[in-house]
Amino acid sequence: MKPLIQVQGVSQRFSTASGEFLALQNVSFDIYEGETISLIGHSGCGKSTLLNLIAGIALPTEGGLLCDNREIAGPGPERAVVFQNHSLLPWLTCFDNVALAVDQVFRRSMSKGERKEWIEHNLERVQMGHALHKRPGEISGGMKQRVGIARALAMKPKVLLLDEPFGALDALTRAHLQDAVMQIQQSLNTTIVMITHDVDEAVLLSDRVLMMTNGPAATVGEILDVNLPRPRNRVQLADDSRYHHLRQQILHFLYEKQPKAA
């Protein structure tokens, strides 16, 4: 199977007041169509830097990245990003926030009526059809993230990039959105790359977990295959010995092999 995303010998340096800082060193891995990949590691290990490189928001100092066998040289609609901060424009309705992305990508290929139907379809997909005409200040944090996901999906991306999208949410809202992401991935076969600090979230959602070494000069230390059948049910997994074994492997890497500095 041909990889959809290829990260090839990537290093990333930054100039700082105290000199050059090597954030990532010689990072290489492939991501295949329909996979859900989690990036996990301690703060400062370069997870967001790596996601920004895949998004094309930044370019690597060394090495290269490919999406569908084309060089990633900047942002593109085939790689949609959802940040922890929903990034919705507060003066626009939920519908209009999604419309900004849809109009930019599909203005020439869809009629105005088709774009309207597509926007509504994607908001319905994340259970936000009831809030089309509400502004961000009128809805909850979890609902804002749903609109952000709808906006990303409406671009018809090949890859959905999630930068700790549930980190600021309460536990129940977080669980509902995790379930929504699993349902979307299953129905659309979307390729997902997600940053998380949550070990349980990584095991629940992922096909593979990329565990990052501590920075500076961080790299992928180990890759864990999550061979749990889908669809996954969090209640059933709580009693599954395989789930607990996978969880323990991640914890062992993070706190035994890569202990966080005090």
From Swiss-Prot:
Main location: membrane
Membrane topology field: Peripheral membrane protein
Gene Ontology process terms (BP): nitrate assimilation
Xref: Pfam families: ABC_tran
InterPro entries attached to this UniProt entry: AAA+_ATPase, ABC_transporter-like_ATP-bd, ABC_transporter-like_CS, ABC_transporter_ATP-bind, NO3_transporter_ATP-bd-like, P-loop_NTPase
Domain ABC transporter positions: 5-239
Compartments, as annotated in UniProt: Cell membrane
Biological function: Probably part of a high-affinity binding-protein-dependent transport system for nitrate. Probably responsible for energy coupling to the transport system.
Protein name from the UniProt record: Nitrate transport protein NasD
Native species: Klebsiella oxytoca
Gene for this chain: nasD
